[in-house]
C-alpha cells in the first residue's frame, strides 16, 4: 500500500487488488464539482474506473472515495515504485485540474453491440435526495460526462456506486441541490434528458 500526502488535505493511497486491477483511495475536502474533478483526474492519469464507492461525511465537509481501476497501458500488476509514481501523478493531475483539462484517451474502441439504456429516478423524501440509476453501455469518458451533467445543474453527489460488468455499466447516484432544496420535477426532467444525450452519444 502506497500512501501519499498523509498529513495534507488531499490523501491518495494506491495498492494492487488482483490481476491488473488497482484499488485507489482518495480522501479530500468536499467541494463543488469534486466528482467531476476526480473522474477527469483518474482518466488523465491513464486509468479506467471499473468500480467506485463515493461517500461524503455527515457534515459534507469531507469526501472519501474508493475506486477500482485498471491501467490502460498494460495488464500486469504494478511494482511498488510504479504505485508511488501513480499516486504522485494522481495528486499532480488533481491539483492542476482546470476547465481546460483534456480527457485522457485510452484508445478503447467504440462498442459494436449496445446494451439497453435505462435511467431511473426516485425520491427519498425523508433525506430530501434523489436516487438516479443509469444502466447503459460503457465507453471512454462516460463517467466524467455524467459527472459534468450533475455539475452543470448545480447538484451535489452525496454518495455514488459505480459498477462495470464487461461492456455494461450500472451507476447509482444520491443527489441533492447545492442549496439543499429538493430537486424540482422540471429540473429532474431536464437532467434526465441531458443524461440521455450523454449515454446515447455513441449509439
Predicted regions and their residues:
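Regulatory modules associated with amino-acid/nitrogen control
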Residues: 1-203
Amino acid at each position: 500500500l502506497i500512501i501519499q500526502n498523509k498529513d495534507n488535505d488531499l490523501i491518495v493511497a494506491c495498492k494492487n487488488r488482483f490481476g491488473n486491477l488497482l484499488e485507489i483511495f482518495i480522501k479530500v475536502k468536499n467541494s463543488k464539482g469534486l466528482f467531476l474533478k476526480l473522474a477527469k483526474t483518474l482518466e488523465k492519469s491513464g486509468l479506467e474506473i471499473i468500480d467506485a464507492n463515493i461517500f461524503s461525511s455527515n457534515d459534507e465537509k469531507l469526501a472519501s472515495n474508493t475506486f477500482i481501476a485498471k491501467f490502460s497501458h498494460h495488464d500486469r500488476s504494478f511494482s511498488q515504485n510504479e504505485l508511488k509514481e501513480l499516486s504522485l501523478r494522481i495528486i499532480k493531475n488533481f491539483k492542476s485540474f482546470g476547465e481546460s483539462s483534456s480527457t485522457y484517451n485510452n484508445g478503447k474502441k467504440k462498442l459494436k453491440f449496445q446494451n439497453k439504456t435505462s435511467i431511473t429516478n426516485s425520491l427519498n423524501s425523508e433525506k430530501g435526495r434523489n436516487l438516479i440509476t443509469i444502466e447503459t453501455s460503457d465507453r471512454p469518458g462516460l463517467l466524467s460526462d455524467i459527472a459534468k451533467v450533475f455539475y452543470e445543474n448545480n447538484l451535489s453527489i452525496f454518495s455514488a456506486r459505480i459498477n462495470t460488468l464487461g461492456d455494461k455499466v450500472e451507476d447509482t447516484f444520491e443527489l441533492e441541490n447545492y442549496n439543499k432544496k429538493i430537486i424540482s420535477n422540471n429540473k429532474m426532467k431536464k437532467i434526465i434528458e441531458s443524461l440521455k444525450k450523454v449515454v446515447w452519444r455513441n449509439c
